Amino acid sequence: MTSQVAAAEVAQPYAQALLSIAQSKNLTEEFGEDARTFLGLLRADKQLHNFFSNPFIQAENKKALIKQILGEGSNPYLRNFLLILVDKRRIAFLESIFQQYLALLRQLNQTVLAEVISAVPLTEAQQQAIIQKVIAISNARQVELETKVDSELIGGVIIKVGSQVIDASIRGQLRRLSLRLTNS
């Protein structure tokens, strides 16, 4: 298993190369959507992640699976990029490469990533309210929400933007109240 620091170090030049290709062909958003889709597949299917990470599986098998996943109508630049990753034995870092690519794309578009943890799934109106709040706080042009549900929060939300955390959850309020009571 690769450490996150090593994976990030290996992934950075590949992510920058992918962004460079995407910019030269005016495909940054299309590649971004493809990266999000691939990340979703890798996170949902651990067998797929393990297949790409396994050094004992033949490169030709990995290439065949990539071609099968992407299909015939896929972007040839992205397909060739993924096949090069297989040839260079860097396909195990695919998740990190796509994460880095999306981070570079957000930076390029002046978009911030806001991780929102709530006790129940958020409605569209609640998501829009959070987006407006994050835009006001961060001065970003756009906000990309990544939502998670954690029933242990009891109620409310926790919003993480970069290193800033806004804890408006009932669990957080109870914890702060408990600290105040123990300190007095």
Curated annotation (Swiss-Prot):
GO cellular component: plasma membrane-derived thylakoid membrane; proton-transporting ATP synthase complex
Keyword annotations: ATP synthesis, CF(1), Hydrogen ion transport, Ion transport, Membrane, Thylakoid, Transport
Listed Pfam families: OSCP (PF00213)
InterPro entries named in the record: ATP_synth_OSCP/delta_N_sf, ATPase_OSCP/d_CS, ATPase_OSCP/dsu
Recorded family membership: Belongs to the ATPase delta chain family.
Known partners and oligomeric status: F-type ATPases have 2 components, F(1) - the catalytic core - and F(0) - the membrane proton channel. F(1) has five subunits: alpha(3), beta(3), gamma(1), delta(1), epsilon(1). CF(0) has four main subunits: a(1), b(1), b'(1) and c(10-14). The alpha and beta chains form an alternating ring which encloses part of the gamma chain. F(1) is attached to F(0) by a central stalk formed by the gamma and epsilon chains, while a peripheral stalk is formed by the delta, b and b' chains.
This protein's name: ATP synthase subunit delta
Organism, as annotated: Nostoc punctiforme (strain ATCC 29133 / PCC 73102)
